[in-house]
Amino acid sequence: MAIFYKNQGFSLTTTNATTVLSINTSSVAIVKDIAVTNTGSSPATLDMYVYDYSASTTYQFIHASVQGACNGNAAQTVLNLEEGDAILAQTPIVNVIKGVISYALLDRTGENG
């Protein structure tokens, strides 16, 4: 098993829920931090979800108002993502919420069993 430490940036350019991180079906991930910033001058609501691939269900884990011109951590705890899981984000104001997800990717490609 190989462990890769990665960062995944995102910018919300639509009001629809957007996949900001997806885990392939041969890996799992441990999300350490989701840093977000609001580059606008007004507060923006941020909703974040985990899509559980094995249950075909989406769970909301963040509903927050991100103040204008500020930074913050959207992940208040570590998130464990299994094979096929994803993180989605949504905001009603486009082009102001941006972020970086820091995570460890545990790649099981080539494992026996």
What is each PLM-predicted segment?
Residues 1-29, 33, 91-113:
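C-terminal interaction-tip segments
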